[in-house]
């Protein structure tokens, strides 16, 4: 006021005017425009953003925690290998075209030539929540409703002379224990010619733990002498990046009142290895994330060997990487988990949904 020779009132009005002028009333518009431009650019790179404010959050991402099945891979399971009675059977490249061909040592075998194989396929069709839908017209293809793993089992059965619908009609389901990430297995109960059959499918460890015998040439033999061969074959299949399911059963004269309690003394039937190929665009996407300073961690319920094989295939993992299983994660306190998260290459395998949540919280 002394230099401008203003009265007190005029000076006060000038001060208020300057204060108002200093407020960036165009800031919101500027930020919104910048975010909108970023959103359009991300859309050009196949990234869909529903909320504008999420663009800013995505810009600060430094770690991606991703599942394997259906994210890194296509989520399209196809049966590749069966293993029954110490015999590996190639059942790959099947999808409702020509009659399915199975091979042992490069030699074709006819469907039904191995009774244990046929029974194992029947178990896969019974312990199953999927459904095959026939073609609706000329030129139309078969469709499968349900989980990709169930779909692979149904297709393998259909291609090798086992009609899933016929099997399910002959042995109607009377009870089910759905797949549980903690149990890592599923069980169903069916009426059967010989009484009642309990069908079980899931990860090898929990299934084999409940088995007391092994199916060989149509009869149950002691498991002890065959356990190591089963475990060795699973190791071989998982190293190839295959998801491996174990199938087992038990026939009882009367229907049990408690299916969970009856899951003991099972007969091991066989293994089925399923291939889920990586998405073709994943390798480049992961490399772009790496160049941007974003680290990728795989968090999956699959076997450690399967996860590492797929991760190596997409260039995300090598022999120097670290793998932590769900059982190992249980022994880690928050401090040790935080230290483990600093590993440049990291896979969490055989983890439950609750453990996945814990991992993401620790990353934050």
What are these regions (language model features)?
Residues 1-364:
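Conserved cytosolic headpiece of P-type ATPases
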């Amino acid at each position: 006021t002394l230099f401008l020779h203003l009265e007190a009132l005029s000076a006060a009005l000038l001060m208020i005017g300057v204060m108002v002028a200093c407020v960036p009333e165009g800031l919101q518009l500027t930020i919104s425009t910048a975010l909108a431009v970023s959103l359009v650019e991300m859309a050009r790179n196949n990234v869909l953003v529903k909320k504008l404010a999420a663009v800013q959050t995505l810009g600060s991402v430094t770690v991606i925690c991703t599942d394997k099945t259906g994210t890194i891979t296509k989520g399209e399971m196809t049966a590749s290998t069966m293993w029954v009675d110490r015999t590996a059977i190639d059942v790959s490249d099947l999808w409702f075209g020509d009659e399915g061909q199975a091979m042992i040592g490069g030699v074709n075998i006819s469907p039904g030539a191995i009774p244990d194989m046929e029974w194992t396929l029947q178990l896969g069709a019974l312990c199953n929540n999927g459904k095959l839908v026939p073609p609706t017209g000329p030129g139309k293809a078969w469709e499968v409703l349900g989980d990709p793993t169930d779909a692979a089992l149904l297709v393998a059965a259909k291609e090798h002379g086992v009609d899933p619908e016929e099997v399910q009609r002959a042995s109607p389901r009377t009870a089910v224990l759905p797949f549980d990430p903690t149990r890592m297995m599923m069980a169903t109960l069916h009426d059967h010619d010989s009484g009642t059959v309990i069908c079980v499918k899931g990860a090898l460890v929990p299934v084999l733990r409940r088995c007391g015998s092994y199916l060989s040439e149509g009869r149950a033999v002691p498991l002890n002498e065959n356990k190591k061969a089963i475990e060795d074959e699973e190791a071989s299949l998982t190293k190839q990046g295959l998801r491996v399911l174990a199938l087992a059963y038990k026939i009882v004269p009367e229907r049990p009142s408690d299916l969970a309690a009856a899951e003991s003394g099972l007969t091991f039937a066989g293994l089925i290895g399923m291939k889920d190929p990586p998405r073709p665009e994943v390798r480049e996407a992961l490399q772009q994330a790496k160049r941007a300073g974003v680290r990728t961690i795989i968090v999956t319920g699959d076997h450690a060997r399967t996860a590492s094989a797929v991760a190596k295939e997409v260039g995300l993992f090598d022999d120097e990487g670290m793998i932590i299983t769900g059982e190992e994660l249980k022994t880690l306190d928050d401090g040790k988990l935080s230290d483990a998260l600093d590993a440049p290459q990291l896979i969490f395998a055989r983890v439950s949904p609750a453990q996945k949540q814990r991992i993401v919280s620790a990353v934050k």
